[in-house]
A protein has these predicted regions:
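Asp-based, Mg2+/Mn2+-dependent phosphohydrolase catalytic module
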Residues: 2-31, 42-43, 47-154
């Protein structure tokens, strides 16, 4: 299978059931922020996402944010949720993802990477041997570069 194809896809992150993780032996989910947990520049997740995060944590799934966005954007967002994070992750490069796995003490086979972009989130997950989960972006991309990239992803 191509490194550009996710193992699974969902419209929104909050539509991924707990059983999805349990049936695959996944104990960790690494989460993108913008257009996955919330819209760009929004300091808090949508209420449906908050409920999803709580249900996943209560199920025993460990969550961590892995974002290409800046420390200034990611830190307050993650800290507000009580989640560990890695900002400036440079996905699809695998260094920060391997750092996250080491920090959490898990193997790639136990880990899902969830995000809205094929050329960053999905490629990063596939190259590392993690389960790649694609969600649709929460809103259209505001910048021309991202709009072109989205067209290529389709």
């Amino acid at each position: 299978m191509s490194v550009f194809f996710p193992h699974a896809d969902f419209k929104r992150i909050y539509q991924i059931p707990t059983e999805f993780f349990q049936q695959r032996g996944l104990t960790v989910a690494l989460l993108d922020v913008d257009n996955t947990l919330t819209t760009h520049d929004n300091p808090t997740p949508h209420k449906e996402v908050l409920g999803w995060l709580e249900r996943k944590l209560n199920s025993g799934l460990r969550l961590m944010i892995l974002s290409n966005n800046t420390q200034e954007r990611v830190a307050p967002f993650a800290e507000g949720l009580g989640l560990e994070y890695i900002a400036d992750a440079h996905k699809p490069l695998g260094g920060p993802l391997r750092q996250a796995l080491g920090k959490l003490g898990v193997r790639p086979e136990e880990t899902a990477v969830i995000g809205d972009q094929i050329f960053t989130d999905i490629l990063c997950a596939r190259l590392a041997g993690c389960t790649a989960v694609l969600v649709e972006p929460m809103e259209p991309e505001p910048m021309a570069f991202f709009r072109v990239k989205r067209t290529l992803e389709r």
